[in-house]
């Protein structure tokens, strides 16, 4: 099966993409652009010559190739991003019939499909936060923003968490009430948000169009009257679809964030749970989300459409920031009023930073594993590890599940603090002989990071996130070059072990 990557790779040449094939199946490639093709392409734009049989046949052949390429490309997008993302890419990206599928169009259609599918590596995770927004196009179409906290990690579905924060006015706003503080209401789910973001007139036309097409399909086109034929032309746009209750709604732009702590891919339950070091604090977000809802019930909080703190976008951002978004990207408030577009841009920036750090963390893990290929390094590191015997995993698992007693938790924290000191001393011992001309900038940066980023039981989530990001990025740069000696490889393994201690303290911090 042809995938999206094949189209992206073929489009890099700048030529239009075509789909050919043989008995083995379809093949994507860049169209040949020789002297003949260049000549016919030129003649197809000359008024006196474009109607010649040879030129017309060439132009029709190109149009057919472009249509076939587009059909296969949309199918590939559907396989990767789902039918909704592929439909959006077709609606917004393939505007002219028979237009060439070139690098710009491939890039735009992939971008549109990704947008409707959702952005972020956390989408398949069991513990995630979803920031949703509908585009703001002025006061008449203000859009919306909401946030959902999901936790489906427990095998018992009754213990799953679904907390949705969606801030709305409790009454329909008039044209002069944009600055008024009025009573708020909160909606309980994304499905209700979707229904609220489609106008009654649009919903009516969608129903009429669907009914007309069904009638024409059943009775035949020739029996349809003019009104039915007209209604049948009104198709749903990208994002407009029926839910399982047969209600029309408009899908949002989605940005996915991982929750800090143990997590797993819902698509592959056989894989062991892995610790996510960089993410948002689920417990803190749940507390703030419930505070917001209580404030709506008590009347302490109000809704004001043009506001930095009391509209839908500002409330969604409030809960996002409560989870530690500013540990990754500083937040800058809007000058006059928050809006879904500004909120979406900030959410994207936070998601990109979190995903980049987690990818860097995984890359560091893989590279440090390869350091064990050296027998001497493996033996030396085993000797050091066995001398300590402490492990971060039991603490992290127990802290994350809330099963460890306070006494046991403190004992484990003390054990990890001793291990931090031992790793630091081992790193200093390995570095003792390297000074002056034998110590390069990378060594100095790593030594400084190890000194500044040693975790402790006093660190909160913000401090641990800051230390982890500095150490991961510094070690990642250090690993770009192969270690010149065994001591250099062991220093890198010591730094990697320190990241493991940060994970252990992080697990305790989010469980506190």
UniProtKB/Swiss-Prot annotation:
GO terms for cellular component: extracellular space. The keyword Secreted applies. It is found in: Secreted. Residues 347-376 form a coiled coil. SUPFAM superfamilies: Non-globular alpha+beta subunits of globular proteins. InterPro entries: Globular_prot_asu/bsu, SptP_N, SptP_N_sf. Keywords: Coiled coil, Secreted, Virulence. Plays a role in mediating bacterial evasion from the host autophagic pathway. Belongs to the BopA/IcsB family. This is Effector protein BopA. It comes from Burkholderia pseudomallei (strain 668). The lineage of its organism: Bacteria, Pseudomonadati, Pseudomonadota, Betaproteobacteria, Burkholderiales.
């Amino acid at each position: 099966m042809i995938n999206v990557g094949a189209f992206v790779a073929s489009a890099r040449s700048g030529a239009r993409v075509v789909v050919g094939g043989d008995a083995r199946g379809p093949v994507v490639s860049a169209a040949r652009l020789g002297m003949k093709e260049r000549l016919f392409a030129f003649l197809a734009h000359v008024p006196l010559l474009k109607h010649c049989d040879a030129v017309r046949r060439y132009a029709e052949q190109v149009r057919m190739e472009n249509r076939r390429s587009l059909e296969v490309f949309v199918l590939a997008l559907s396989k990767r991003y789902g039918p909704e993302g592929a439909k959006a890419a077709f609606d917004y990206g393939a505007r002219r019939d028979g237009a060439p599928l070139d690098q710009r169009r491939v890039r735009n259609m992939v971008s549109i499909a990704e947008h409707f599918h959702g952005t972020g590596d956390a989408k398949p995770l069991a513990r995630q936060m979803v920031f949703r927004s509908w585009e703001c196009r002025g006061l008449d179409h203000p859009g919306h923003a909401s946030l959902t906290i999901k936790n489906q990690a427990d095998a018992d579905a009754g213990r799953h968490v679904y907390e949705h924060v969606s801030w709305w006015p409790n009454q329909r706003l008039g044209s002069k009430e944009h600055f008024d503080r009025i009573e708020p209401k909160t909606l309980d789910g994304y499905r209700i948000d979707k229904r609220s973001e489609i106008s009654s007139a649009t919903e009516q036309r969608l129903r009429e169009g669907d009914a007309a097409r069904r009638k024409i399909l059943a009775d035949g086109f020739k029996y349809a009257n003019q009104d039915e034929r007209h209604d049948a032309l009104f198709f749903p746009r990208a994002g407009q679809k029926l839910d399982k209750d047969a209600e029309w709604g408009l899908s949002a732009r989605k940005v996915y964030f991982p929750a800090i702590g143990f997590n797993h891919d819902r698509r592959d339950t056989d894989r062991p749970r892995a610790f996510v070091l960089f993410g948002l604090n689920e417990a803190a977000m749940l507390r703030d989300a419930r505070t917001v809802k209580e404030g709506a019930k008590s009347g302490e909080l109000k809704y004001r459409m043009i506001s930095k703190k009391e509209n839908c976008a500002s409330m969604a951002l409030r809960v996002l920031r409560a989870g530690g978004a500013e540990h990754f990207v500083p937040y800058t408030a809007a000058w006059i009023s928050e809006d879904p577009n500004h909120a979406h841009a900030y959410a994207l920036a936070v998601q990109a930073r979190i995903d980049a750090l987690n990818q860097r963390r995984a890359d560091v893990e893989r590279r440090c594993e390869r350091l064990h290929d050296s027998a001497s390094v493996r033996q030396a590191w085993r000797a050091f590890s066995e001398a300590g015997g402490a492990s971060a995993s039991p603490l992290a698992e127990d802290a994350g599940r809330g099963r460890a007693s306070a006494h046991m938790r403190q004992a484990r924290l003390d054990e990890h603090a001793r291990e931090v000191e031992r790793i630091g001393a081992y790193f200093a011992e390995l570095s003792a002989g390297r000074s002056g001309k034998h110590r390069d900038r990378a060594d100095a940066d790593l030594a400084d990071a190890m000194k500044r980023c040693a975790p402790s039981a006093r660190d909160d989530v913000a401090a641990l996130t800051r230390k982890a990001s500095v150490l991961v990025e510094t070690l990642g740069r250090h690993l770009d070059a192969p270690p010149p000696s065994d001591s250099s490889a062991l220093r890198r393994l010591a730094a990697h072990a320190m990241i493991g201690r940060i994970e252990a303290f992080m697990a305790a911090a989010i469980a506190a």
